[in-house]
């Protein structure tokens, strides 16, 4: 090979990039890289961007303002999709660390609704589940309106089993049935590791179980995007969810992007819904 273009190199394993470069045996071989910024501890930032002069690299920093084909309203829409660390990375192009609250844009005055919409045959309904035995079992019932292009979490289930109040999958299934009631749900989105609970749901044949897309960082980006775009709301009764929103934080001790794995069960089921169902509902819109 005489050269390689690495598109979105920050998403590639370091071993893959180094193996591809090792195959460029032609004298004067060249490499091209592009990417959105990630954590400043990322190997590409440490080994290439910070060593640009040492490696004889031409490093160019671009933002949307450098793309003359983007209309002002398109740039404004993109800028409105992100806040916090994702705004600084994807809009400003900065290699910054994730810190503070994961969802600082969540606002009780903006994202909470007082009434549950009436059942509507044109709406689509989903349930998302974060399975727990010792840890809490959290689930949310979601109402998606195609005409309004928004979803509302209309009910929540938050069961703190613990070691003394642990129940079996049959009891959890009964709780889910009570949560769903008369809602004609599309399917139940569930933690992909909860194989025994998936089997229980499938055994009864009443609801379809779909394994959630458990990509944590991309799922967090989806939730962020939908909150900012005005596509995601919550009924006032979902109090455990609100409590988690206001404490769910980045782990600033980690070199890579990671959340603190405490009091995150409703946040997980919300992420499952956004990543697995709402992203598909809004893929041509947001």
Question: What is the predicted function of each stretch?
Answer:
Residues 1-2, 95:
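Inter-Walker segment of RecA-like/P-loop motor cores
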Residues 3, 11-81:
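ASCE P-loop NTPase helicase motor core
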Residues 10-11, 133, 146, 194:
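Short, glycine/acidic-enriched loop or turn micro-motifs at the edges of active sites
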Residues 60-62, 91, 212:
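Hydrophobic residues at beta-strand termini and immediately following loops
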Residues 67-131:
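ATPase catalytic-site recognition across NTP-hydrolyzing enzymes
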Residues 137-143, 271:
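Short beta-strand scaffold segments in enzyme catalytic cores
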Residues 140, 147-261, 278-285:
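Mg2+-dependent endonuclease catalytic cores in nucleic-acid-processing enzymes, primarily RNase H-like
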């Amino acid at each position: 090979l005489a050269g390689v273009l690495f598109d979105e190199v920050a998403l590639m394993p370091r071993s893959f990039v180094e193996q591809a470069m090792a195959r460029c045996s032609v004298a004067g071989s060249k490499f091209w890289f592009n990417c959105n910024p990630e954590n400043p501890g990322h190997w590409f930032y440490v080994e290439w961007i910070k060593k640009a002069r040492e490696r004889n690299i031409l490093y160019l920093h671009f933002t949307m303002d450098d793309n003359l084909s983007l209309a002002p309203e398109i740039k404004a829409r993109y800028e409105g999709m992100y806040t916090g660390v994702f705004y600084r990375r994807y809009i400003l192009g900065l290699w910054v660390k994730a810190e503070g609250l994961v969802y600082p844009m969540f606002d009780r005055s903006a994202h909470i609704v007082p009434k549950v919409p009436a059942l509507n045959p044109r709406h689509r309904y989903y349930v998302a589940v974060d399975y727990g035995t010792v840890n809490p079992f959290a689930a949310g019932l979601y109402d998606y309106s195609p005409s309004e292009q928004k979803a509302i979490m209309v009910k929540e289930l938050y069961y703190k089993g613990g070691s003394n109040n642990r129940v079996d999958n049959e009891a959890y299934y009964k709780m889910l049935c009570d949560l769903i009631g008369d809602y004609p749900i599309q399917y139940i989105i569930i933690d992909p590791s909860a194989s025994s609970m998936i089997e229980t749901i499938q055994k009864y044949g009443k609801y379809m179980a779909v394994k959630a897309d458990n990509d944590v960082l991309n799922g967090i980006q989806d939730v962020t995007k939908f909150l900012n775009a005005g596509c995601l709301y919550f009924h006032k009764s979902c109090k455990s969810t609100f409590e988690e929103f206001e404490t769910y934080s980045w782990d600033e001790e980690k070199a890579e992007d990671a959340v603190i794995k405490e009091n995150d069960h409703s946040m997980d089921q919300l992420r499952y819904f956004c990543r697995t169902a709402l992203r598909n509902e809004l893929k041509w819109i947001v």
